[in-house]
């Protein structure tokens, strides 16, 4: 059914209070959006960081008397009689179909394709990973995932063991197995990621080759020929002593989830233990790779 969208620009400090006001006025959902489209990266644990100028967006049933809603909001102390707003009518759509239409098979490197299950496989002779958007991060659409997939495609993984540190959907571990790895290990702090990785591995016929751990379950003597960690710059720096110990001597390390502006500080945390390659960039993100000394 159609909807009415009401957008009000406020400050990050006042966004929560205004959100409550929209909910009390009948909004069925309220979302926040940066007015200037500037992303926020790596909030502190337990923190929901907002932008300086924040759009508070309320969604109302089309039958709502929006004039009455506006009259009520004008009495709110944060707004007043002359507050600025924008109203938009949202047409009725098959949102599930539109969502599915946005996902297409994607190629990474020379051999590897990531394919949603509702699309035909472009090249049956290629290495095809069947993966649908779902419970956890990682479908290949984000530049950091793409950088890691391209790197894995360029390695000879036959007979190798691979660790996917921060496995999310399991996309990197599963891709490594489909590219010839003998065994993969996925580690993630989120139990939903473990569930998603297991489900995706079963869908791709590699579940018996993938071992999954929450951090507290991880064996202390865990090592691999290849380690890939697509998380964020802060955790990559903080967890460097742990991650450095995972690759075997002569093994390979791939790090992403890093903004290009953060590459130098992350590389410094690993430079003593690895012979590092030139940094690879995609859009504003980058990938750091190297060989264990």
UniProtKB/Swiss-Prot annotation:
It is found in: Cytoplasm. GO terms for biological process: methylation. The keyword Membrane does not apply. SUPFAM superfamilies: S-adenosyl-L-methionine-dependent methyltransferases. GO terms for molecular function: protein-lysine N-methyltransferase activity. Its EC number is 2.1.1.-. Keywords: Cytoplasm, Methyltransferase, S-adenosyl-L-methionine, Transferase. InterPro entries: Ribosomal_L11_MeTrfase_PrmA, Ribosomal_PrmA_MeTrfase, SAM-dependent_MTases_sf. GO terms for cellular component: cytosol. It is an enzyme of class 2 (transferase). S-adenosyl-L-methionine binds at residues 145, 166, 188, 230. It catalyses: L-lysyl-[protein] + 3 S-adenosyl-L-methionine = N(6),N(6),N(6)-trimethyl-L-lysyl-[protein] + 3 S-adenosyl-L-homocysteine + 3 H(+). Methylates ribosomal protein L11. HAMAP family: Methyltr_PrmA. This is Ribosomal protein L11 methyltransferase.
